Amino acid sequence: MISLVYSPEYAKHHTGTHPENQRRLESIMNYLQEEGELEKLDIQEPVPASSEDILRVHTPHHLNYLKSFSEKGGGYLDFDTFASPQSYEIARLAAGGAIKASELVLNQDYDFAYSLARPPGHHATGNRAMGFCLINNLAVALEYVRKRYGLKKFIIFDFDAHYGNGTAEIFYHDPQILYISIHQDPHTIFPGEGFIEEMGSGEGKGFNLNIPMPPGSKTSDYIYILEKILETAYTEFKADFSFLDVGFDGHMEDPLSSLHLDDNFYPWIGCHLQKLTPKMVLVLEGGYCYDAMARSNLKMIKVLRDKITNEDRWQAQGELKVKDEIKRIFKKIQDTFSPYFTF
């Protein structure tokens, strides 16, 4: 079973014509309704994350500043991250959505729970909002689960087009958390981080695994490299709990990346991950082409809901030839991580 954690209150994070605006979630929910799928899904309401929950990840200064900034009317926190008068409260609700999704998987008969929330979170560091993100929703949920349930090892897979620098920074020294991110080459896209060499530090070295993909990478390129990495990583790391950071901005129709994924990637990754982890919490991040996001989201939800694990049906037709550059990237990852994983 799969549950969606969603609230219309997320629309109160008013951002005007900013790319990260309320139409993102509206397009998803409207499409689910139009396709007759909404009534087939269990929709759960989130509750705001407590200050205690958030402060396991973020500094008091960060939380107080967000609150004060919003209450004073909001505006741009940096060159591209916007907050409105209600954004602080809605960001707490978004973090609470990720916690609620985690609770559903841990306490009820749900294999998958999907926090369909905004603002997104994976660029938010412990002390800074950035990249459209105010509070790191997934990190807050993970630390909640670690504290409440005593689970020790976690795996996070992030396929947003942009590297989740905030999530990576928060857990960079932690050997109990494996963060895997596949994203567009950081030479060519925000935030300019996420190179293979950024592999964790101290005891956490070897547990921050970046897969930087060149602009123009297609579904077949992603499938080639993920088939070589994910199964080994999930099998050898042996996590107690799994999170998935969901980003639709790698789609070929998305205006904020130069990747060329098609609709088939999203059901494919849903099929593939089901074979690697029996339960999983999904947390929405990016995606800025409303139509592509709505279509791809539904396809991914369907394979999770219906327990479809036949990946072959989603293999991109006529794209069997993988660029040599992709093979070189895998070889570099294989060599760099050889002390940690047997890719």
Language-model features and meaning:
Residues 47-71:
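Charged, often glycine-rich, active-site loop that binds/positions anionic groups
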Residues 19-23, 45, 57, 89, ...:
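Residue-level detector of secondary-structure boundary/capping sites
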Residues 20-21, 61, 241:
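Basic, low-complexity intrinsically disordered segments
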Residues 26, 30, 52, 56, ...:
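N-terminal, well-ordered alpha-helical segments
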Residues 1-53:
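N-terminal low-complexity, Ser/Thr- and acidic-residue-enriched intrinsically disordered segments
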Residues 3-5, 10-13, 64-343:
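A general "terminal functional-core" signal
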